[in-house]
């Protein structure tokens, strides 16, 4: 996990900070490639507080339960929040991929889930869909990188570049407002460890402006 909650019970000053950034100096904060996102919303802050209290009480990993709401509306925009490993986050990522109409971009430290790899390949084979991806851990055990390349998916390795590509985000249909421009980000790598063992969080924001900001990155 990498999140902060500020004043969850405040109606005007409730904040959540999420994304991929560890508070480590100097690597993650100043050198590695990461993203941080701030959301001001009381309901989302309270959902994160429920998750924090569960872990504060000693429940981690598979001992946690799916006890938080997942769907919110912030300034008229749909926002979703999922925690791992309790909330079946991978199934939501699969839906995110399958719902793409035109474009999908992803930037990931690790990508080792076969089901997600297959979903990306199947989506890339659909007429009119353009997919681009960046993966840091090209040669880690079980990496989907070689499978994606062999299938003709436009994916690039970040391995060997100075400083780590520590992101865990994906962007759907960023420049197609007739579709559903959406950002998916957080601390959840596309891996079985993130799905089944690690304590992670994922934020999905249905908003063209936010999606385009991440597309520019």
Summary of predicted features, one role per range:
Residues 1, 5-217:
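Charged, low-complexity intrinsically disordered terminal segments
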């Amino acid at each position: 996990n990498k999140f902060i909650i500020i004043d969850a019970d405040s109606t005007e000053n409730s904040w959540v900070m999420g994304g991929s950034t560890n508070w480590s100096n100097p690597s993650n904060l100043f050198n590695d490639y990461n993203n941080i996102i701030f959301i001001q919303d009381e309901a989302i802050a309270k959902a994160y507080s429920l998750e924090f209290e569960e872990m504060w009480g000693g429940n981690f990993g598979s001992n946690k339960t799916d006890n938080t709401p997942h769907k919110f509306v912030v300034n008229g925009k749909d926002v979703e929040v999922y925690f791992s490993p309790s909330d079946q986050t991978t199934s939501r990522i699969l839906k995110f991929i399958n719902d793409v109409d035109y474009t999908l971009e992803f930037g990931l430290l690790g990508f080792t889930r076969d089901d997600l790899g297959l979903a990306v390949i199947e989506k890339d084979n659909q007429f009119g869909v353009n997919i681009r991806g960046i993966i840091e851990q090209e040669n880690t055990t079980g990496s989907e990188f070689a499978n994606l390349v062999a299938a003709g998916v436009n994916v690039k390795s970040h391995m060997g570049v100075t400083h780590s590509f520590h992101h865990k985000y994906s962007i759907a249909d960023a420049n197609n407002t007739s579709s559903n421009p959406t950002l998916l980000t957080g601390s959840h790598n596309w891996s079985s460890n993130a799905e089944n063992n690690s304590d992670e969080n994922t934020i999905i924001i249905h908003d063209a402006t936010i999606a385009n900001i991440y597309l520019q990155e």
